[in-house]
Regions:
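Well-ordered beta-strand positions in beta-sheet-rich domains
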Residues: 38-40, 66-69, 116, 149-151
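Short acidic/polar, Gly/Pro-enriched loop/turn segments located at secondary-structure boundaries
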Residues: 32-34
Length: 206
């Protein structure tokens, strides 16, 4: 039994055609905060992550945008060639744009970090069957087999932190210390949210 296809998957063929023919796409789009806007995009490639399709491209202001299909209310293919600039062509390939990334977010201010984690039995079997990231390498195993340690070269984006949290108490960050402290702070905020029922995600005043 397969999972249900991602929402608005019917746009995929038209978007791939626009990429191939270097056409632009016109979207009516809703942001995560409920703001609706019209966007003109020159698409470069698409990416599937956690049952959501995304189109990555350049808007009219030469800004890179990453738009999930499921927030598109209306889409039109503008059948007129509008090639990407040479600079954007070099940047906007999956390998170069997502170098060192996990998931869909590419934060300009997040540098690739050498991260060391510890995974406890039996969770380490899972992340060896389905690695967290292509750079994942096993570097240590305890004598009693209770844990294994791994290194990863990855940007610590929100997507990556959420993946670590998904594994719960079965994975802990060892290095760098800054990321370890960040994870501890997130867990403390989560605990306070559960205890008080109040928002602790940094967006309380929105």
């Amino acid at each position: 039994m397969l999972e249900a296809p991602p929402r608005n998957s019917e746009y995929l063929d038209d978007i791939l055609c626009a990429i191939d023919k270097q056409y632009q796409l016109k979207f009516h789009y809703a942001t995560p905060y409920g703001v609706e806007k019209d966007i003109m995009l020159s698409p470069a490639f698409v990416r599937l992550f956690k049952q959501r399709w995304y189109v990555i491209g350049v808007n009219e202001n030469e800004q890179v945008r990453c738009l999930p299909f499921d927030r598109i209310a209306f889409m039109e293919v503008v059948c007129k060639r509008h090639p990407l600039s040479a600079k954007m062509k070099r940047l906007l390939t999956p390998d170069s744009f997502y170098d060192g990334c996990f998931g869909i977010m590419r934060m300009e201010d997040e540098q690739i970090e050498n991260i060391r984690i510890r995974a406890f039995y039996p969770e380490y079997n899972l992340i060896e069957e389905v690695p967290l990231h292509e750079s994942q390498q096993k570097v240590k195993e305890s004598a009693d087999g209770l844990y294994r340690e791994y290194t990863l070269a990855v940007r610590p984006s929100r997507d990556f932190l959420q993946e670590l949290l998904w594994h719960g108490r079965n994975i802990v960050v060892l290095k760098p210390e800054s990321l370890k402290r960040q994870m501890i702070d997130i867990l403390k905020d989560m605990m306070q949210s559960y205890e008080t029922g109040e928002c602790r995600n940094g967006e309380e005043d929105l």
